[in-house]
C-alpha cells in the first residue's frame, strides 16, 4: 500500500514538472516572438526614417534657386525671377555669342519660368565693365525663352572687349503686362542710365502704369583671346 502511494506521489510530481516546463517553453517562445516583432517594427521605423531623410535631401537638392537681386538698384524694386542660359559655361559666354574676330555674334540662349499675367518680355544686355555699353535690346518677346541667334544685328551685337581683357556682361529680362510704345537705349552706346530705361517700361503703350510684373537677371564674363 505504501509503495502505491509513493508511486502516485512520484507520478504527480513528474506531471507537474512537465506542465511547468511546457509553460516555460511557451513563455520563452512568446518572448522570442515579441522580441522579433519589436525588432521588425524597429527596422521598419528606421527604414521609413531613412526614406524620409532621403526624400528631404532630394527635395532640397532639386529645389530651384531663389532669385535675389537686392544688390542691383536697377531691378531690386521688382519681383524677381531666375534666368537660365545654355550659352554660359563656367561663368563665361560662348565664343559664338561674341563679336570678336570671326565669331558669329549670336544672341545668347535664354529661358525663365513664365511670369503670371505677363504678355511679353524685354531683354537688355549691358557691359558693366565699360560704362554699361548696350549690346542687346529686344522687345515683344512673347514666350519665356529665346533661342540662340533669336535677335538680328539691329538688336544685338556680341561682346568684344579689348584684346586680352575680361569684361562682365549682364542680361536683364523684364516681364510686362502689356507692350510698350518703344524701348529706350541705343545699341553700341554707353547706357549708365539703364535703370531709367527699365523704369520707363512700367508705362505701357496706352499710358497705363504698373506695367512691370517682374525682373530677371543673368551675367557672364567674356575674354577676347582672338
Language model features with spans:
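Positively charged n-region of N-terminal signal peptides that target proteins for export
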Residues: 1-4
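N-terminus-centered regions that define maturation/targeting leaders and the start
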Residues: 22-39, 47, 54-226
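C-terminal motif of bacterial Sec signal peptides marking the signal peptidase cleavage site
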Residues: 17-20
Amino acid at each position: 500500500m505504501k509503495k502505491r502511494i509513493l508511486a502516485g506521489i512520484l507520478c504527480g510530481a513528474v506531471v507537474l514538472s512537465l506542465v511547468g516546463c511546457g509553460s516555460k517553453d511557451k513563455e520563452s517562445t512568446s518572448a522570442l516572438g515579441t522580441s522579433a516583432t519589436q525588432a521588425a517594427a524597429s527596422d521598419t521605423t528606421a527604414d521609413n526614417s531613412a526614406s524620409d531623410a532621403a526624400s528631404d535631401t532630394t527635395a532640397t537638392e532639386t529645389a530651384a534657386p531663389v532669385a535675389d537681386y537686392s544688390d542691383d538698384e536697377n531691378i531690386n524694386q521688382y519681383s524677381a525671377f531666375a534666368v537660365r542660359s545654355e550659352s554660359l559655361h563656367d561663368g563665361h559666354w560662348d565664343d559664338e555669342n561674341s563679336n570678336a574676330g570671326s565669331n558669329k555674334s549670336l544672341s545668347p540662349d535664354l529661358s525663365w519660368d513664365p511670369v503670371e499675367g505677363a504678355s511679353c518680355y524685354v531683354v537688355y544686355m549691358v557691359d558693366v565693365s565699360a560704362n554699361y555699353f548696350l549690346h542687346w535690346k529686344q522687345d515683344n518677346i512673347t514666350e519665356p525663352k529665346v533661342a540662340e541667334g533669336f535677335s538680328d544685328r539691329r538688336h544685338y551685337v556680341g561682346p568684344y572687349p579689348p584684346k586680352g581683357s575680361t569684361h562682365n556682361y549682364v542680361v536683364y529680362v523684364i516681364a510686362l503686362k502689356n507692350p510698350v510704345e518703344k524701348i529706350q537705349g541705343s545699341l553700341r552706346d554707353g547706357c549708365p542710365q539703364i535703370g531709367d530705361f527699365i523704369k520707363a517700361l512700367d508705362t505701357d503703350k496706352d499710358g497705363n502704369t504698373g506695367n512691370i510684373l517682374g525682373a530677371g537677371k543673368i551675367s557672364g564674363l567674356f575674354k577676347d583671346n582672338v
